[in-house]
Amino acid sequence: MDGAIQSGDLKLAAHIAQPSRAAAGPRPALVLCHGFPAGPRGALTSAQTYPDLADHLVAETGWTVVAFNFRGTGESEGNFSLLGWLDDVRAAVDYAVDMPRTGGVWVAGSSAGGALALCEAAEDDRILGVATLAAPAEFDNWASDARAFLAHCRLVGVIRDSSFPPDVEAWAAEFKKVQPLAAVAEIPPRPLVLMHGSDDPTVPVSDARALADAADGQADLRVIAGAGHRLRHDPRAVAALMGWMERQGVH
């Protein structure tokens, strides 16, 4: 079903996928975080396949899956900021925790959404495990030329208001404040799987290796041979994600 998640003053569009025949007792929930949109006006369309992925995961695992749109994307309100997106992950986790019969919450994310999943899990022990697909280890490339990246944000449509951000320097400083590489060390011993395509042209596979190293060998690193950046479209990555879900010991 379609729903809305409150993140501060903003409403985020969400797709809540649940088993058609719910088993008795608590049911695990997965919060699914999309990545940064690609291409002109990509903010409107780039996350459109996530509801289908959520439905597929539910059909195969029996979990509840919450797939939401970050602020500035799809039908969600607001404009992109990195700390704002981190707030959105927390709001989605709050929503999942408060759903009736939730039996624990896990988070999975693609690209920037995966990096933010790591950062939220480092601060939120309600999150019982994290799976990432093509997550970057840091956001320094966005910080390197903040005004050029701001122009890119307007092009893809994640910043819709001409008056936003009110302070470009403060907006850009958030890219240095959000540090997935530091956050990942706080997640073990909770389950952590890092999936990455060996031929990812957007986020190099070295980022996944750096994250795994920072987790002190306690992450399950899966490098998928020949795969690119959009792992949600790779059946091997989706199968690995479902296998990870099934190993969480909740069935």
Model regions and ranges:
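Glycine-rich nucleophile elbow surrounding the catalytic serine of serine-hydrolase chemistry
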Residues: G109-C119
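The alpha/beta-hydrolase serine catalytic core
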Residues: L12, W106, D124-A210, A214-V223, ...
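Glycine-rich "HGGG/HGxG" loop immediately N-terminal to the catalytic nucleophile
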Residues: F68-L82
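Alpha/beta-hydrolase fold nucleophile elbow
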Residues: P100-S111
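N-terminal cap/lid segment of alpha/beta-hydrolase-fold proteins
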Residues: M1-A24
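Short, surface-exposed "cap/lid" segments of acyl-processing enzymes
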Residues: S20-E60
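Alpha/beta-hydrolase active-site loop
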Residues: T49, N79-M99
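Short beta-to-alpha linker loops that shape the active-site pocket of alpha/beta-hydrolase fold enzymes
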Residues: F36, N69-T73, P136, A227
